[in-house]
Design a protein with these regions (language model features):
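Auxiliary tRNA-acceptor-end handling modules of aminoacyl-tRNA synthetases
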Residues: 1-293, 311, 320, 326-394
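Stable alpha-helical elements in mature extracytoplasmic
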Residues: 297, 301-304
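Sec-exported extracytoplasmic/periplasmic mature domains
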Residues: 306-317
Length: 394
């Protein structure tokens, strides 16, 4: 279609939200207005469960807050009146000042995963803003804003039920866009976990559709990544692996960067920090407590987080980490917002806890963590205590 005048697309009825790009809601449609200054910038998309089906607890994504997937994308101007979205991989590295760079680049073409026809264009000084209609792409089934094929296989989902799936809310902020959708899937015959597949071979299984409420966070990553720190196998850190083509001129070196929080001294405290004095970080780590956590546990979870302050003092930072109750009077706060870290309460019989995190794949910077605290974790701690200390307990 030919480009339309801006006022004909973004009419006076538009509800506009200002984020790192503008989002317009007009007559049931969501338009993204993307400045050309954002072309080539890395945007991290993180997908999580907000609400899960009644019988999903034994599956990979069966509880609110469960992580689904993440990927890095970039917008770019395509041929003609089109905007492209590329999915970006950081599995292979070569510096742009060295001889291998172009060869590595030619062997790592980043795939175009979506194309959007331009609806209109707006000039704003030296900047050109491109407007695309994202409604159908967000609402329909795709791995960017929904389940990956692997997760769908795990939960036993097949095709999405179009008329039972919709965009619930979309909100824009300076560093992120939050999209909430409701998605209903037909059950895959004989799908789901290994046990479900085995039972399906002998018994009739439910044909009731699966309805999930999902949240997708689009985070604008820093233009300059945090300085990475190389992984050392002798030290117990999680790490991001990649192939390096520069260090060995006659071979390939497999390297990894540790994942770590971006704790930096304030500019005015840098000299104190370098002298070994304790200083407060520019941005402390805040771990919120899931608002649905039973109230009797909240003070102890907060204290458990705060107890880690002593460990960070060994690294030169005081007041580096805090546990806090989730705000109940802030309508913009959400447990699924990928800017926020949280301890998430899971009403589950799983006797465990886990601490997965989301990081910047370029540097290993931890952006947030959702620590899973399962209701039945006390049985694990009890059994550990009996095994390890039962023989000497008075």
């Amino acid at each position: 279609d030919a480009l339309q005048p801006y006022a004909k697309v973004i009419t006076g009825k538009a509800k506009t939200m200002d984020g790192f790009f503008k989002v317009h809601y007009v007559d049931g449609k969501y338009f993204f207005e993307i400045a050309d200054s954002l072309f080539g910038r890395d945007i991290l998309i993180v997908n999580r469960v907000v609400k899960a089906p009644v019988d999903a607890q034994k599956r990979k994504v069966g509880y609110p807050g469960d992580y689904i997937s993440d990927e890095v994308i970039r917008f770019e101007k395509g041929r003609g009146d089109k905007l492209f979205v590329r999915e970006i991989s950081y599995l292979e590295h070569s510096a742009d000042t060295l001889g291998m760079y172009q060869a590595v680049l030619n062997s790592n073409v980043q795939p175009i995963v979506a194309t959007f026809p331009l609806k209109t264009v707006r000039k704003e000084g030296e900047t050109t803003n491109y407007v695309i209609d994202m409604t159908d792409y967000i609402r329909k089934d795709n791995e960017m804003f929904s389940f990956t094929s692997r997760v769908k296989d795990n939960i036993g989902a097949s095709s999405m039920v179009d008329d039972a799936s919709y965009i619930d809310t979309l909100k824009a902020f300076p560093q992120n866009i939050e999209i909430r959708t409701v998605r209903t899937f037909q059950r895959k015959k004989g799908g789901g976990s290994g046990l479900e597949k085995l039972l399906a071979a002998f018994f009739a299984t439910s044909t009731t559709p699966l309805t999930y409420e999902l949240n997708s966070s689009m985070l604008l990553l820093p233009k300059e990544p945090m300085k990475p720190r190389l992984h050392d196998d002798r030290v117990g850190y999680f790490a991001v692996s990649y192939k390096d083509f520069d260090e060995n001129p006659q071979g390939v070196k497999y390297k990894a960067n540790i994942t770590r929080w971006r704790l930096e001294p304030k500019d005015e405290d840098r000299e104190k920090y370098l002298r070994g004095e304790l200083v407060e970080p520019k941005k402390p780590i805040i771990i919120y407590i899931d608002p649905v956590t039973p109230k009797k546990w909240v003070p102890y979870l907060i204290q458990g987080v705060n107890d880690w302050q002593a460990a960070f003092e060994k690294a030169g930072f005081k007041n580096a980490i805090f546990g806090k109750e989730a705000p109940t009077d802030d309508p913009t706060w959400s447990l699924e917002d990928a800017r926020h870290s949280a301890i998430v309460y899971k009403p589950s019989d799983i006797p465990n806890a886990s601490g997965p995190h989301v990081h910047d794949p370029r540097s290993g910077e931890i952006l947030e963590t959702h620590i899973n605290w399962y209701h039945n974790v006390m049985s694990l701690l009890y059994n550990w205590y009996i095994v390890q200390a039962g023989a000497i307990h008075p």
